[in-house]
Regions:
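Transmembrane alpha-helical segments of integral membrane proteins
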Residues: 94-110
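Short aromatic-rich membrane-water interface segments that cap or initiate transmembrane helices
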Residues: 45-58, 112-123
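Hydrophobic cores of alpha-helical transmembrane segments in multi-pass inner/ER membrane proteins
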Residues: 59-69, 124-137
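Membrane-interface helix-loop junction between the first two transmembrane segments
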Residues: 30-45
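N-terminal signal-anchor transmembrane alpha helix
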Residues: 9-34
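Cytoplasmic juxtamembrane regions at transmembrane-helix boundaries
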Residues: 76-93, 148-151
Length: 151
């Protein structure tokens, strides 16, 4: 891959975006299977159809954001890149978890390990995602005020 060494670290964003786009594609086919009423898909996703749709759309949105930050070619600190890549997955996976485990729809009534860990996972995901994309947005915005190099 030919890339300016100054932006090489941002390749993580490109890799994550491609992976999460593939996840969205797989979920799109799962939505087709669910809509056709194929029993195997309903067995895998016993939760609400809308949760699979939300996961699909969120993976698409997160992929688009990651592709956009990569395309901006603004160097980002490693911790921001990783927070964006991880947060893009965890944020989308919250909907997927609810589709796979319907008991998570009402965590206050649910019991067990999944019900106990879900609120912690949710808050960690929101914090990581907010930090990554928030800091990334501030970094890109600040870069627009820097003097352009002379040509």
């Amino acid at each position: 891959m030919n890339q300016d060494p100054k932006h090489m670290g941002n390749v993580l964003l490109l890799r994550a975006a491609a992976l999460w786009l593939l996840a969205a594609l797989v979920l799109a086919w799962c939505l087709v299977g669910l809509d056709f009423g194929i029993p195997a898909f309903k067995a895998v996703f016993p939760g609400k159809f809308v949760r699979v749709l939300q996961a699909h759309l969120d993976f698409l949105v997160m992929s688009a954001l990651l592709f956009g930050f990569y395309a901006a070619k603004v160097p980002l600190p490693w911790h921001v890149r990783w927070a964006m890549a991880v947060g893009a997955f965890t944020n989308s996976s919250l909907f997927l978890a609810q589709a796979l485990f319907p008991v998570l729809e009402t965590p206050e009534q649910a019991q067990g390990f999944l019900a106990a860990i879900f609120p912690i996972y949710l808050m960690a995901s929101i914090l990581i995602t907010s930090y990554g994309f928030g800091k990334g947005a501030v970094t890109v915005l600040k870069s627009t005020f820097e003097a352009a190099p002379p040509r």
